Amino acid sequence: MTVLNEQNTMQMLQYIRVFLSKQQDSMLKLLETMVQIESGNTDKAGCDTMCSLVEGELRALQVETRRVPMSEKGDFLHGVWGDCYPGAPILFSGHMDTVFPKGTLRNIPFRIHDGKAFGPGCLDMKAGLVVAIFALRALQESGFC
């Protein structure tokens, strides 16, 4: 466990900045993979596929996951990591469904244009899921816990 003080907090933040700057390609690849999964809010199979992907990403980071099966909507996913640091926990919260119906990818495929990513669910909230996963990865790499 790292005891944080002003000096090592600044060192850790610098390490995290450098680490994340080197992860851009990996982050975009994961975002593209997520966007390619059509997970409209009425598409249980698509939402469950997204849940499996996120669960796999979290488990690869040694996050203890618990999946809550749902009968009509996509499954819920709960993950816990980092109980080795005293103090307030860090909460990542999000959703894996989109408002886009199945088939939208044919007309609105994933693309990068002028440094911005586009595609169904890109903004709400698949990019947020990627950010959360890579934030956790950065914390682990920095020795936070």
Residue ranges and their predicted role:
Residues 126-145:
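Acidic/histidine-rich catalytic neighborhood of metal-dependent amide-processing enzymes
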Residues 8-120, 141-145:
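Acidic/His- and Gly-rich active-site-bordering loop/insert found
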